[in-house]
């Protein structure tokens, strides 16, 4: 199981939210590029970036910071936040990211997702963010009527290779992942499932690996020191 450190961008800084609430923002650094280099040095094979301002605005806004990060590290960088049309997705790849994460558009316009998968293949990742199993959209500020399991099945049928599942109620809380909801998305020959939200201990990562989860995105726990990335990678990815 791959461990993926998260960098959430807001106003050019590295921040974390609690349960997606923009009013509960903690700043963890003014130099996201240095943070990305830190995670690469710790052994990360991939870095996860969310443009929080972009998610709220409906279009990417932190483009200069994102481009600086992709130039500063040699590992793949995946980007989410405000990518809701073909033009913004093409522009994201121009910034040097290896993968884009689509959330709202998967609910609103699955036909576009199918078209993008045909064009970009495995570089298209779907982000399913849910409260009580129901998918949220618009930077978590709106709720759809679609269940996460239904959306995951639909995306798999469209050829999506990877899905990131975030339990919003756990995100930034350092409680524990929602094992049941996350595992419910794992299907034979279906998309690889990556867990996000609530991870606070290496034991949480080990449990996710046992459930057949392909990857785990770690945010708050890295910035608070609850998890040491280099040590966790050694334990989880390399078997101790």
From Swiss-Prot:
Its main location: cytoplasm. GO terms for molecular function: 1-(5-phosphoribosyl)-5-[(5-phosphoribosylamino)methylideneamino]imidazole-4-carboxamide isomerase activity. It holds the Pfam family His_biosynth. One of its GO terms (biological process) is L-histidine biosynthetic process. Pathway: Amino-acid biosynthesis; L-histidine biosynthesis; L-histidine from 5-phospho-alpha-D-ribose 1-diphosphate: step 4/9. It is found in: Cytoplasm. Keywords: Amino-acid biosynthesis, Cytoplasm, Histidine biosynthesis, Isomerase. The active site is at 8 (proton acceptor), 129 (proton donor). One of its GO terms (cellular component) is cytoplasm. It is an enzyme of class 5 (isomerase). It catalyses: 1-(5-phospho-beta-D-ribosyl)-5-[(5-phospho-beta-D-ribosylamino)methylideneamino]imidazole-4-carboxamide = 5-[(5-phospho-1-deoxy-D-ribulos-1-ylimino)methylamino]-1-(5-phospho-beta-D-ribosyl)imidazole-4-carboxamide. Its EC number is 5.3.1.16. Belongs to the HisA/HisF family. PANTHER family: 1-(5-PHOSPHORIBOSYL)-5-[(5-PHOSPHORIBOSYLAMINO)METHYLIDENEAMINO] IMIDAZOLE-4-CARBOXAMIDE ISOMERASE. HAMAP family: HisA. This is 1-(5-phosphoribosyl)-5-[(5-phosphoribosylamino)methylideneamino] imidazole-4-carboxamide isomerase. The gene is hisA.
């Amino acid at each position: 199981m791959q461990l993926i450190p998260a960098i959430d961008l807001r106003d050019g800084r590295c921040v974390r939210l609690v349960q997606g609430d923009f009013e509960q923002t903690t700043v963890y650094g003014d130099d996201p590029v240095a943070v990305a280099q830190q995670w690469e040095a710790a052994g990360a094979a991939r870095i996860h970036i969310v443009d929080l301002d972009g998610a709220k605005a409906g279009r990417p806004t932190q483009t200069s910071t994102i481009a600086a990060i992709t130039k500063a590290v040699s590992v793949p960088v995946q980007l989410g936040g405000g990518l809701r049309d073909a033009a913004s997705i093409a522009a994201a790849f121009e910034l040097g990211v290896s993968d884009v994460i689509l959330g709202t558009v998967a609910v609103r316009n699955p036909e576009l997702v199918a078209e993008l998968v045909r064009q970009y293949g495995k570089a298209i990742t779907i982000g399913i963010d849910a409260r009580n199993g129901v998918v949220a959209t618009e930077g978590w500020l709106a709720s759809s009527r679609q269940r996460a399991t239904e959306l995951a099945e639909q995306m798999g049928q469209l050829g999506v290779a990877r899905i990131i599942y975030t339990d919003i109620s756990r995100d930034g809380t350092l409680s524990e992942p929602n094992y049941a909801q996350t595992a419910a998305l794992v299907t034979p020959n279906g998309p690889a499932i990556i867990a996000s939200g609530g991870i606070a201990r290496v034991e949480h990562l080990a449990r996710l690996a046992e459930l057949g989860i392909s990857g785990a995105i770690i945010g708050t726990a890295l910035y608070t020191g609850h998890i040491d990335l280099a040590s966790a990678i050694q334990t989880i990815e390399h078997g101790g």
